[in-house]
Amino acid sequence: IYGTREKLATFFNCPRPDHVVFTANSTEALNMAICGLLNPGDHVIATDLEHNSVLRPLYRLEAERSVSLSFVPADRQGRIDYGKFERLIRPETRAIICTHASNLTGNAVDIGRVGAIAHAHGLIFLVDASQTAGVLPIDMEAQQIDLLCFTGHKSLMGPQGTGGLCLREGITLRPWKVGGTGVQT
């Protein structure tokens, strides 16, 4: 298992193999990242290209934790106005969450450009690579990605029921599942 972590860390240029977390699928990885990251009163920017695996946890946190949401619209051809990200940033903005490519249109987002915007403003950048992991190049360091969520069963050629989350150094998430051994570890 650790060998697979090492391969994924190398493939995505994730700084450390022990920062690769295995999940049942991308939906679980996205829920773990989104729910583990956001706090009451945080503001998040996403696009209107997002999959329900991003939208539903965001809407839930909007209702339960008073997380506020803004969306960068795509035009009729599915293209993003990248300047809109900066125009939506507020003092309470915590993160930008962005799909790498739409599952409906196939349009790809320049995640390197969005990552640069996020980091220029001290924001966390979370990428949903469910459609692109194994298809388009993804480099967490070069594209300034803090959290990368992916599924294993599509272009990574893994079995159904596999996915993962890669975290940049210094990113911590609130646990969303608890239980187990009874020994504090």
Describe the predicted segments one by one.
Residues 1-185:
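Pyridoxal 5′-phosphate
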